[in-house]
Amino acid sequence: MKPSLFISLIIFNAFKCFCQTPDAESIVEGIQSSAYFGNAVSHAGDVNGDGYDDVIVGAYMYDNGQINEGVAYIFHGSEFGINTSPALILECNQASANFGASVSTAGDINNDGFDDVIVGANFFDNGQSNEGRAFVYLGSLTGINPIPNATLECDVVGANFGIAVSNAGDINADGFDDVIVGANLSVKAYVYLGSSDGIDTVETATLSNFQGNSQFGFSVSDAGDVNADGFDDVIIGAYKFDGEGLNSDGGIAYLYHGNALGLITSPATILEEGFYSTYFGYSTSGAGDVNNDGFDDVIVGEYQADF
């Protein structure tokens, strides 16, 4: 039987974090067994503009009229912490779509003062089997609007589009946040720009990799502004990329810079460790400015490394 997962949202005293195990501030749980609640989690920003940040949780095997349709839960923050009853449950109404396989804040894509969210459904069918889809939802005074502002897709059979979704920051510095979606089985990632109307459904950039089995796009993330030029950047992992020599499945991560036109499609930096089958790039994320030098930093996971 598939396990039912839960997540703990933890707030603790930073000065004590290395000497004792912190207690959970809140525990939010799914209401259906084998739904894989908690497979994907993210902060959601402040979706209702009340001054308290919110969270989003995916449960991609949830049955809600359709088998394994999947759902995503929005939980609102408050002065007492996270409300453990969901404010909203999002769904896509298609069986086996894997809706909620990935979830993320989208930033404020229409610059209305309310943060927005994006949800991936990597097995969604719309003319092509398992092409995948990503759904963008806008925040408002009452929270997330359950009707998507935009649905994004790539029209490629078996692309796994939506296996990874993320806010991309504001890559062209126009005041509207942008999003990025990975499609690892077609070794691509797609970047979409925000606007006053929401997300433009025509991608501004398509990023790709020359190795067909590299899993490029399995992980995608905003990187912050790594070169402090005023344009946000993105990072993409390809955890099965084969490097030189015996470096099979060593993995790699690519950093792309933003500019006034959108995103420069040639990588500015290529990161790798050069070890055999360590899956470098399985996870990627912006890290903030960890040394406070004015340049944002990144973090890359290498989950099969054994040192």
Residue ranges and their predicted role:
Residues 18-307:
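Conserved beta-strand/short-helix segments
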Residues 1-22:
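Bacterial Sec-dependent N-terminal signal peptides
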